[in-house]
Every structure is written in structure tokens, then in C-alpha cells.
UniProtKB/Swiss-Prot annotation:
UniProt catalytic activity: AMP + ATP = 2 ADP
Region named NMP: 32-61
Record PANTHER family: NUCLEOTIDE KINASE
Domain remark from Swiss-Prot or TrEMBL: Consists of three domains, a large central CORE domain and two small peripheral domains, NMPbind and LID, which undergo movements during catalysis. The LID domain closes over the site of phosphoryl transfer upon ATP binding. Assembling and dissambling the active center during each catalytic cycle provides an effective means to prevent ATP hydrolysis.
Gene: adk
Gene3D superfamilies xrefs: P-loop containing nucleotide triphosphate hydrolases
Subunit structure: Monomer.
Domain of life: Bacteria
Official protein name in the record: Adenylate kinase
Subcellular location: Cytoplasm
Pathway assignment: Purine metabolism; AMP biosynthesis via salvage pathway; AMP from ADP: step 1/1
Lineage: Bacteria, Bacillati, Cyanobacteriota, Cyanophyceae, Synechococcales
Biological process terms in GO annotation: AMP salvage
Biological source species: Synechococcus sp. (strain CC9902)
Enzyme class: transferase
Amino acid sequence: MKNRLLFLGPPGAGKGTQAARICDSNGMKHLSTGDLLRSEVAAGSELGKEAEAVMNRGELVSDQLVLAIVESQMKALSGEGWLLDGFPRTVPQAEALEPLLNELKQPIEAVVLLELDDAVLITRMLSRGRADDNEDVIRNRLEVYRDKTAPLISYYQNKGLLISVPAQGSVEEITERICKVLD
């Protein structure tokens, strides 16, 4: 199974849930930028306060901040497999990440795109109960995804790394689909 992965997809598509399942069953490190940022917010650090204000507006945290977090996490890994969830979100971030991964001799092996309709995404996100999940913020996040993140689809498709997976159905069904395409 490929073990250096990137998950893409709109907010609410199940990236975090599926990433955790894939990592647990395959002994991979789950690098979730969303979780890293939320832990900074919970810690109340200056960085966390800055990130919280941006996230509460449904906007993206700066490239420099997220790349620094990812770099420190990647350097701490000793050759184990990893799954990057929530970064990169823009083509410039992907272009900044690539030389870092090449320097670490850990290039991405596959990019899994979880695809799901907006109506299902909105329903899922409203049911999560996160402070930053209200309908206006969710619609803004979907718009930001379309503007900033969706161009990554063609970026990774052109590199021959993109694998699309339908993200409807039960958690188990989606995990099974992902495992099948990664073998």
C-alpha cells in the first residue's frame, strides 16, 4: 500500500475521519493541520489567537505558518509512512511543499480526492458541533475551497498522483474504497 499520502476534498467530506482510519490500520502518522491549528487555539498561544480569528471567518491560515508546522512534523518522522490532511490547500502551498518533501526524500505517492455534493457536506458539517461550523461560515468555506483548493485537483492530476474516491455512504464503505485504490 502507498504510505505517503495527501487527502484532498471539500470541508466536511470526511478527510479527517478517513485519514485516522487509514493511518490506524496501516501504522502511518496522521498529520492533520486542522488538528494542529485547533490545538494551538486551545492552548491560547499568540499563534493560536491569530489562527482562531482567521478560522472563525472561514478563511485560510497563512501559508508560512502552516508550512512551518508541517515542516517540523515531517522532520520528526523517521521514515514511517504519513498522511497529510488539510495541507496543501493552494497550488502555491503545494509548490512550496514539494521541495521540502524532496529534500526529506519523502515525496507524495498518492493524492486521494474525496468527492461529495454540497448539500451533504453542509448537513455533515452542521452536525459536527464545532464552534466554527455555522451555515454562513460553512458556505464561505466551500467558496474558499472552490476558489483556492480546487485548482490542486488539476495540479496533482497533471503529476499523475490524483485518485478520486466517492465519499458518500458509510464510514466503512468509504474506507474500503480508499484502501482498494491505494493497494
